[in-house]
Amino acid sequence: VEFLDVVRRRKTTNGPFRPDPVSPEHQRLLMEVAGRAPSQLNSQPWRFVLVDDRSMIERIATISGESMTEAMSNGTFFERYKPYFRFSAAEMQESRSGMLFDKLPAALRPFTKQVFTRRGQKLMNSFRVPQTLGEENRKLVAGSPLLIGVMLDRSEYRPGELSSFYSVFSMGAAMENIWLTTVEIGMGIQFVSFPMEVPGRWAEIESLLGVPDDLELMAVYRLGYLPADQQRPAIDWSSHERKLPSQYVFRNTCATPETEWDDR
């Protein structure tokens, strides 16, 4: 696959993976490309823990599913991220950013405009939407053959200092290398983020992974091979839209948007 095709095809996998274990060769490759990422002064602050033990994956999946249910039930998730929710193609076309919820059960579609109100939250809770989403999330994580915990060396990652920015920037480059490589080898990847949304749950995952005091757990991802027929969850979204170059590129100064590329 040509490199630019890989970049353009990169995406998050919301659906299930095949149950096949990720081969040792591919695990090794993913770690190699991560280690090839740039870092300030070649500090290489990243550390990774590969999780393929079924019982541990199941336990992390339970934490993730419960976290999603709680964050959805109490409204904190919708309140925190409502600027990024879209419920029509027109909304998505106008903003060219965020997530378009284009797959919803028929019973919920009439209530999308109320999702950010108290009444909307009560309706979702009465339809047990948080429980449905939480269980879907649990099953997705539990069905993943591989999880990757991404950590930073605390001697490099020092919040409030410039070194912290360098470390996070380097970690992002390492993860992008992994992400692009999954496209090349027929795999998918998704951020397991909900345990970070609920106080105390992230610490449970740190404990499960045995993260030592000199490392900071920054993220967990689920990975696996993509099935030929990719099934979408009962409630799903897409995020293919991208801003026009003139919305994020400037020429010489930030007062002059680059307008020549929008029609390409």
What residue ranges belong to the model's regions?
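Acidic, surface-exposed loops and disordered segments
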Residues: 1-264
